Swiss-Prot record:
Protein's organism: Vaccinia virus (strain Copenhagen) (VACV)
Taxonomic classification: Viruses, Varidnaviria, Bamfordvirae, Nucleocytoviricota, Pokkesviricetes
Name of the protein in its database record: Uncharacterized 9.2 kDa protein
Amino acid sequence: MDLARLGSMSSYDFSTVVSVLLVSIRSMSRSIESKHDRSEDNEYLYASFCTVTSRFVRCLHRALTSMVQILSSLCVSYSSLL
């Protein structure tokens, strides 16, 4: 799955986002090892890492927000039963 498609998904699959993040970190570390002396490549890799990390944080935020909404609705439902 490429990052452009990941950014346009309306509902995020947490495991997919984590796997994309890990794959991008692995590829960046390989690139850094092979091209560690080129500052332009390092700047590009740093920008790519920041992009992937920000998408991961947005996905995590959406997932946590959804969990809080579900838990609050369950609490309201449970309290109405009492």
